[in-house]
Amino acid sequence: MTKRIITISREFGSGGRFIGEEVAKKLGISYYDKDIIGQIAEQSGFAPEYIRENAELSPKKGLFAYAFSGRDITGKSVEDMVYEAQRNVILKIAEKESCVIIGRNADFILKDREDVLNVFIHGDMPKKVQRICKLYNVAEADAAKMITETDKRRRTNYNFYTDQKWGMAKNYTLSLNSSQLGYERCGEIIMECVK
């Protein structure tokens, strides 16, 4: 297999992280998800805990609050500095090796590369709620709230930094419904596309 980069954007609870990890294992390529946080922290100078809480989900207080957030002398906000560090780390990883990258707007950051397969994993709300209840041991109402809030923050971040619409099929090579296809079949389809 020639070098391939697979980016997986996903709705919370759709199993995108699990699917990506399985694809990476089966293809024998690197997998980048939360472990990328250390590299982003090093590049940005912010603590890993701050990156973990804010990188993928900022601007977390909305665009109005973002407009009034602190800035450095170049006019960049803290969120912008974290995003720039994240972008640089993703570009370096893509240059280095075949891999699966979960989230972090990697699909947009790498969109001009010919060796990239951009995937969006989504699912039906009842199945996502069921998965989150099981993973986090929470009630259905709490799971639904977690899904709605996490996806809203991901959407805000993506739409702000990319000028594209998060989850819109035309922004991805593949858009797969894990509730209808199942996690295993989603993984098989992704692997068929990179052969």
Residue ranges and their predicted role:
Residues 93, 109-112:
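RNA pseudouridine synthases
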Residues 30-41:
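Short beta-strand-centered segment that lines the nucleotide-binding/catalytic pocket of NTP-utilizing
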Residues 112-134, 140-148:
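Conserved phosphate-donor/acceptor-positioning beta-strand/loop module used by diverse small-molecule
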Residues 87, 183-191:
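Short, amphipathic alpha-helical "lid/cap" segments that border enzyme active or binding sites
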Residues 8-21:
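Glycine-rich phosphate-binding P-loop
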Residues 2-11, 97:
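Pre-Walker A (Motif I) flank of P-loop NTPase domains
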Residues 59-66, 139-184:
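Small-molecule kinase domains that catalyze NTP-dependent phosphoryl transfer to phosphate-bearing small molecules
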Residues 41-98:
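ATP-dependent small-molecule kinase phosphotransfer cores
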